[in-house]
Amino acid sequence: MKRRQRLTARSRLRAGIRCHNRFYNAMVQDLASAKRNGVYGERLAPLFSELVPAETLKTALGVSLAFEVNLGQRRPDCVCTVQFGKGSDAKGVCILIELKTCRFSKNMNTASKNLQRKGGMRQLHDSCRLLARTLPPGSGEIVLAPVLVFVAQRGMRVLRVTRLSPQVVYSNAAVLSCTISRLAEYAPPVSAKSTRRRCVAKGTKAKAFSTKAAAEPVPSITPAQPSAAAAVVSLFPAAVPANTTNAAAVHQPVAVSHVNPLAWVASLFSPK
Protein backbone atom coordinates (compact mmCIF):
# COMPACT_ATOMS: atom_id res chain seq x y z
CA MET A 1 0.00 0.00 0.00
CA LYS A 2 2.76 2.45 0.95
CA ARG A 3 4.71 1.52 -2.16
CA ARG A 4 1.67 2.23 -4.32
CA GLN A 5 1.23 5.62 -2.65
CA ARG A 6 4.88 6.46 -3.30
CA LEU A 7 4.53 5.51 -6.95
CA THR A 8 1.38 7.61 -7.25
CA ALA A 9 3.11 10.61 -5.70
CA ARG A 10 6.07 10.20 -8.05
CA SER A 11 3.85 9.92 -11.11
CA ARG A 12 1.97 13.06 -10.09
CA LEU A 13 5.26 14.90 -9.61
CA ARG A 14 6.50 13.82 -13.04
CA ALA A 15 3.20 14.86 -14.63
CA GLY A 16 3.46 18.28 -12.99
CA ILE A 17 7.03 18.74 -14.22
CA ARG A 18 6.04 17.78 -17.76
CA CYS A 19 3.16 20.25 -17.67
CA HIS A 20 5.47 23.01 -16.43
CA ASN A 21 7.89 22.35 -19.28
CA ARG A 22 5.14 22.31 -21.92
CA PHE A 23 3.72 25.55 -20.57
CA TYR A 24 7.14 27.20 -20.65
CA ASN A 25 7.55 26.30 -24.30
CA ALA A 26 4.03 27.51 -25.09
CA MET A 27 4.74 30.83 -23.37
CA VAL A 28 7.82 31.38 -25.52
CA GLN A 29 5.85 30.83 -28.72
CA ASP A 30 2.79 32.79 -27.55
CA LEU A 31 4.81 35.79 -26.39
CA ALA A 32 6.82 35.86 -29.61
CA SER A 33 3.55 35.85 -31.56
CA ALA A 34 2.08 38.63 -29.39
CA LYS A 35 5.21 40.75 -29.86
CA ARG A 36 5.06 40.23 -33.60
CA ASN A 37 1.31 40.67 -34.13
CA GLY A 38 0.24 42.91 -31.24
CA VAL A 39 -2.45 40.45 -30.10
CA TYR A 40 -2.43 38.17 -27.05
CA GLY A 41 -3.53 34.58 -27.39
CA GLU A 42 -5.94 32.80 -25.07
CA ARG A 43 -3.19 31.73 -22.66
CA LEU A 44 -1.40 35.06 -22.28
CA ALA A 45 -4.37 37.43 -22.22
CA PRO A 46 -5.34 36.80 -18.57
CA LEU A 47 -1.68 36.96 -17.49
CA PHE A 48 -0.40 40.05 -19.29
CA SER A 49 -3.22 42.18 -20.71
CA GLU A 50 -3.96 44.10 -17.49
CA LEU A 51 -0.35 45.20 -17.10
CA VAL A 52 1.01 45.46 -20.63
CA PRO A 53 -1.43 45.89 -23.53
CA ALA A 54 -0.48 43.76 -26.52
CA GLU A 55 -0.14 46.76 -28.85
CA THR A 56 2.32 48.33 -26.41
CA LEU A 57 4.22 45.05 -26.07
CA LYS A 58 4.72 45.14 -29.83
CA THR A 59 6.59 48.45 -29.57
CA ALA A 60 8.48 47.69 -26.33
CA LEU A 61 12.24 48.10 -26.52
CA GLY A 62 12.98 44.78 -24.81
CA VAL A 63 10.98 41.72 -23.74
CA SER A 64 12.54 38.65 -22.15
CA LEU A 65 11.46 35.43 -20.45
CA ALA A 66 13.47 33.52 -17.85
CA PHE A 67 12.41 30.20 -16.32
CA GLU A 68 13.22 28.59 -12.97
CA VAL A 69 14.95 31.73 -11.70
CA ASN A 70 17.15 30.90 -8.71
CA LEU A 71 16.73 33.63 -6.09
CA GLY A 72 18.24 31.53 -3.32
CA GLN A 73 15.41 30.62 -0.98
CA ARG A 74 12.82 30.78 -3.77
CA ARG A 75 12.70 29.93 -7.45
CA PRO A 76 9.83 31.55 -9.36
CA ASP A 77 8.72 29.49 -12.34
CA CYS A 78 8.85 32.38 -14.79
CA VAL A 79 9.95 36.01 -14.79
CA CYS A 80 9.03 38.25 -17.72
CA THR A 81 10.68 41.67 -18.01
CA VAL A 82 9.47 44.41 -20.36
CA GLN A 83 11.56 47.53 -20.99
CA PHE A 84 9.96 50.71 -22.35
CA GLY A 85 13.02 52.88 -22.95
CA LYS A 86 16.79 53.22 -22.89
CA GLY A 87 19.11 54.17 -20.09
CA SER A 88 19.18 53.66 -16.34
CA ASP A 89 15.96 55.66 -15.89
CA ALA A 90 13.87 53.62 -18.35
CA LYS A 91 10.54 52.37 -17.06
CA GLY A 92 9.58 48.72 -17.13
CA VAL A 93 7.41 45.89 -15.84
CA CYS A 94 8.67 42.70 -14.18
CA ILE A 95 6.04 39.94 -13.96
CA LEU A 96 6.78 37.05 -11.58
CA ILE A 97 4.72 33.97 -12.36
CA GLU A 98 4.18 30.98 -10.08
CA LEU A 99 2.61 28.03 -11.87
CA LYS A 100 0.33 25.40 -10.32
CA THR A 101 -0.90 22.45 -12.36
CA CYS A 102 -4.23 20.63 -11.94
CA ARG A 103 -5.30 17.16 -13.03
CA PHE A 104 -8.97 17.99 -12.53
CA SER A 105 -10.38 21.42 -13.32
CA LYS A 106 -14.11 21.20 -12.59
CA ASN A 107 -13.79 22.23 -8.94
CA MET A 108 -11.21 24.91 -8.17
CA ASN A 109 -12.05 25.06 -4.46
CA THR A 110 -10.88 21.66 -3.28
CA ALA A 111 -8.66 21.27 -0.22
CA SER A 112 -5.61 20.43 -2.34
CA LYS A 113 -6.09 23.45 -4.60
CA ASN A 114 -6.55 25.72 -1.58
CA LEU A 115 -3.23 24.44 -0.25
CA GLN A 116 -1.64 25.06 -3.63
CA ARG A 117 -3.04 28.58 -3.65
CA LYS A 118 -1.76 29.43 -0.18
CA GLY A 119 1.64 27.97 -0.95
CA GLY A 120 1.86 29.81 -4.26
CA MET A 121 0.96 33.17 -2.72
CA ARG A 122 3.60 32.66 -0.05
CA GLN A 123 6.18 31.75 -2.70
CA LEU A 124 5.36 34.87 -4.71
CA HIS A 125 5.58 37.11 -1.65
CA ASP A 126 9.01 35.70 -0.81
CA SER A 127 10.21 35.94 -4.43
CA CYS A 128 9.28 39.64 -4.61
CA ARG A 129 11.07 40.30 -1.34
CA LEU A 130 14.22 38.48 -2.48
CA LEU A 131 14.23 40.16 -5.89
CA ALA A 132 13.76 43.61 -4.35
CA ARG A 133 16.85 43.03 -2.21
CA THR A 134 19.08 42.23 -5.18
CA LEU A 135 17.98 44.81 -7.74
CA PRO A 136 20.79 46.48 -9.71
CA PRO A 137 21.09 50.24 -9.14
CA GLY A 138 19.11 52.57 -11.34
CA SER A 139 16.48 55.30 -11.28
CA GLY A 140 13.91 53.74 -13.59
CA GLU A 141 10.46 52.96 -12.18
CA ILE A 142 9.72 49.25 -12.50
CA VAL A 143 6.50 47.52 -11.50
CA LEU A 144 6.95 44.14 -9.79
CA ALA A 145 3.75 42.22 -10.52
CA PRO A 146 3.41 38.75 -8.91
CA VAL A 147 0.89 36.40 -10.54
CA LEU A 148 -0.30 32.94 -9.47
CA VAL A 149 -1.56 30.82 -12.38
CA PHE A 150 -3.48 27.53 -12.26
CA VAL A 151 -3.11 25.47 -15.44
CA ALA A 152 -4.84 22.27 -16.55
CA GLN A 153 -2.41 19.43 -17.21
CA ARG A 154 -4.47 18.48 -20.25
CA GLY A 155 -4.51 21.18 -22.87
CA MET A 156 -2.55 23.67 -20.73
CA ARG A 157 -5.63 25.85 -20.34
CA VAL A 158 -5.33 28.73 -17.87
CA LEU A 159 -7.93 27.99 -15.20
CA ARG A 160 -7.44 30.78 -12.70
CA VAL A 161 -5.21 33.83 -12.30
CA THR A 162 -4.61 35.41 -8.87
CA ARG A 163 -2.59 38.59 -8.45
CA LEU A 164 -0.77 40.00 -5.46
CA SER A 165 -0.55 43.74 -4.98
CA PRO A 166 2.12 45.07 -7.36
CA GLN A 167 5.01 47.17 -6.12
CA VAL A 168 7.02 49.96 -7.71
CA VAL A 169 10.79 49.67 -7.33
CA TYR A 170 13.66 51.67 -8.78
CA SER A 171 16.32 49.95 -10.85
CA ASN A 172 17.90 49.64 -14.30
CA ALA A 173 15.48 47.65 -16.48
CA ALA A 174 18.10 46.40 -18.95
CA VAL A 175 20.55 45.30 -16.25
CA LEU A 176 17.71 43.72 -14.28
CA SER A 177 16.79 41.62 -17.32
CA CYS A 178 20.40 40.43 -17.65
CA THR A 179 20.62 39.70 -13.92
CA ILE A 180 17.47 37.58 -14.04
CA SER A 181 18.77 35.84 -17.17
CA ARG A 182 21.94 34.73 -15.39
CA LEU A 183 19.85 33.25 -12.59
CA ALA A 184 17.65 31.19 -14.93
CA GLU A 185 18.14 27.43 -14.64
CA TYR A 186 15.88 26.13 -17.40
CA ALA A 187 15.40 26.85 -21.09
CA PRO A 188 12.70 25.25 -23.27
CA PRO A 189 14.14 23.15 -26.09
CA VAL A 190 14.06 24.58 -29.61
CA SER A 191 11.88 22.52 -31.91
CA ALA A 192 13.43 21.56 -35.24
CA LYS A 193 10.10 22.24 -36.94
CA SER A 194 10.10 25.83 -35.72
CA THR A 195 13.34 26.54 -37.59
CA ARG A 196 11.81 25.74 -40.98
CA ARG A 197 9.28 27.33 -43.27
CA ARG A 198 7.74 25.25 -46.03
CA CYS A 199 6.95 26.60 -49.44
CA VAL A 200 3.22 26.27 -50.19
CA ALA A 201 3.22 27.78 -53.68
CA LYS A 202 1.46 25.61 -56.24
CA GLY A 203 3.80 23.48 -58.30
CA THR A 204 6.81 24.10 -56.02
CA LYS A 205 8.40 21.38 -53.96
CA ALA A 206 8.15 21.95 -50.21
CA LYS A 207 11.50 22.77 -48.69
CA ALA A 208 13.07 24.84 -45.92
CA PHE A 209 13.96 28.45 -46.64
CA SER A 210 16.82 29.70 -44.51
CA THR A 211 16.60 33.23 -45.96
CA LYS A 212 12.94 33.64 -45.06
CA ALA A 213 13.52 32.12 -41.67
CA ALA A 214 16.14 34.78 -41.04
CA ALA A 215 13.58 37.48 -41.78
CA GLU A 216 11.31 36.15 -39.02
CA PRO A 217 13.73 34.66 -36.50
CA VAL A 218 12.61 32.03 -34.05
CA PRO A 219 13.25 32.98 -30.41
CA SER A 220 16.74 31.76 -29.63
CA ILE A 221 17.93 30.07 -26.48
CA THR A 222 20.97 31.85 -25.06
CA PRO A 223 22.94 30.10 -22.31
CA ALA A 224 22.88 32.15 -19.14
CA GLN A 225 26.25 30.73 -18.10
CA PRO A 226 28.62 29.02 -20.55
CA SER A 227 29.75 26.47 -17.94
CA ALA A 228 26.27 25.52 -16.72
CA ALA A 229 22.92 24.44 -18.09
CA ALA A 230 21.22 27.62 -16.92
CA ALA A 231 19.73 29.52 -19.83
CA VAL A 232 17.28 32.25 -20.65
CA VAL A 233 14.91 32.81 -23.51
CA SER A 234 15.55 36.34 -24.74
CA LEU A 235 12.89 37.05 -27.31
CA PHE A 236 13.66 40.66 -28.08
CA PRO A 237 16.94 41.73 -26.43
CA ALA A 238 17.34 45.35 -25.47
CA ALA A 239 20.55 47.34 -25.66
CA VAL A 240 22.57 46.79 -22.48
CA PRO A 241 25.40 49.02 -21.25
CA ALA A 242 28.92 47.62 -21.52
CA ASN A 243 29.36 47.63 -17.73
CA THR A 244 26.32 45.41 -17.18
CA THR A 245 28.22 42.79 -15.19
CA ASN A 246 29.81 45.25 -12.82
CA ALA A 247 26.62 47.23 -12.34
CA ALA A 248 24.60 44.13 -11.57
CA ALA A 249 27.12 43.03 -8.97
CA VAL A 250 26.60 46.18 -6.90
CA HIS A 251 23.47 46.08 -4.76
CA GLN A 252 22.04 49.20 -3.20
CA PRO A 253 19.03 49.78 -0.92
CA VAL A 254 15.87 49.82 -2.99
CA ALA A 255 13.05 52.28 -2.55
CA VAL A 256 9.68 50.52 -2.85
CA SER A 257 6.41 52.33 -3.39
CA HIS A 258 2.94 50.84 -3.01
CA VAL A 259 1.04 53.91 -4.18
CA ASN A 260 -1.33 52.75 -6.94
CA PRO A 261 1.29 51.18 -9.26
CA LEU A 262 -1.35 49.91 -11.69
CA ALA A 263 -2.42 53.50 -12.34
CA TRP A 264 1.19 54.28 -13.22
CA VAL A 265 1.28 51.36 -15.66
CA ALA A 266 -1.93 52.56 -17.28
CA SER A 267 -0.42 56.04 -17.65
CA LEU A 268 2.37 54.57 -19.80
CA PHE A 269 -0.14 53.71 -22.50
CA SER A 270 -2.50 56.69 -22.29
CA PRO A 271 -2.71 58.91 -25.39
CA LYS A 272 -0.28 61.82 -25.31
UniProtKB/Swiss-Prot annotation:
UniProt KW Cytoplasm keyword: no
Keywords: Host cytoplasm, Host Golgi apparatus, Host nucleus, Late protein, Virion
Cited function: May participate in nuclear egress of viral particles. Plays a role in the dispersal of several host nucleolar proteins including NCL/nucleolin and NPM1. Since deletion of host NCL/nucleolin negatively impact on nuclear egress, UL24 supposedly acts on this process through its effect on host nucleoli.
One cellular component (GO) term of this entry: host cell Golgi apparatus
InterPro entries in alphabetical order: Herpes_UL24
Expression triggers: Expressed late in the infection cycle.
Family, as annotated: Belongs to the herpesviridae UL24 family.
Pfam families: Herpes_UL24
Name assigned to this protein: Protein UL24 homolog
Subcellular location field: Virion; Host cytoplasm; Host nucleus, Host nucleolus; Host Golgi apparatus
Key word Membrane present: no
Cystine residue pairs: none
Domain of life per record: Viruses
